[in-house]
Amino acid sequence: MATNITWHPNLTYDERKELRKQDGCTVWLTGLSASGKSTIACALEQLLLQKNLSAYRLDGDNIRFGLNKDLGFSEKDRNENIRRISEVSKLFADSCAVSITSFISPYRVDRDRARDLHKEAGLKFIEIFVDVPLEVAEQRDPKGLYKKAREGVIKEFTGISAPYEAPKAPELHLRTDQKTVEECAAIIYEYLVNEKIIRKHL
């Protein structure tokens, strides 16, 4: 880290919370490709915004068009991908928004580091395992990625030729082959209300 830089203080978290009447947090959606992470993230963001709550979605694919366009899919690059997103999501959470991230984030150690980063800043981190059997994910395969991975066209593909380490104790575990997108978004919303992160809006 450079030594010729200075941290500039601004409004405190509590001051922002009082002004915005909302707590901040990161909702971290993790799971296989085609498990439904992005779809649930979109639905949750819309649900929160419709209730006049501050929320912002960070999507695994979209981020690679800009902030992380220099990264590939090696283990080292995946680590850096999640490190950067952990920092960005923390900034959104610190602004008293609900930061919604939808990333495969296959390695448990990376997700644990993201949690620790938030904990050190006094911010809430909600890990949500978006779970689906591999065969169902392959049947969905909206981008044709599993087919390419099986054919060897895509190397290091999570769930096929690269590992996915499922969460051991996520705050929520959603089976998207058993629940609709709307049901999943509602479950997350109710969790945020019950944990007093947001107030219930009718």
Curated annotation (Swiss-Prot):
The keyword Amino-acid biosynthesis is annotated on this UniProt entry: yes
EC number annotated for this UniProt entry: 2.7.1.25
Active-site residues, Swiss-Prot/TrEMBL: S105
Top EC class of this enzyme: transferase
One GO molecular-function entry: ATP binding
Catalytic activity: adenosine 5'-phosphosulfate + ATP = 3'-phosphoadenylyl sulfate + ADP + H(+)
Binding site for ATP: G31, L32, S33, A34, S35, G36, K37, S38
Cross-referenced SUPFAM superfamilies: P-loop containing nucleoside triphosphate hydrolases
Pathway(s) of this molecule: Sulfur metabolism; hydrogen sulfide biosynthesis; sulfite from sulfate: step 2/3
Domain of life from the UniProt record: Eukaryota
This protein's UniProt keywords: Amino-acid biosynthesis, ATP-binding, Cysteine biosynthesis, Kinase, Methionine biosynthesis, Nucleotide-binding, Phosphoprotein, Transferase
One GO BP annotation of this record: cysteine biosynthetic process
Family statement: Belongs to the APS kinase family.
Function according to Swiss-Prot or TrEMBL: Catalyzes the synthesis of activated sulfate.
Record-linked HAMAP family: Adenylyl_sulf_kinase
UniProt-recorded name of the protein: Adenylyl-sulfate kinase
Annotated source species: Saccharomyces pastorianus
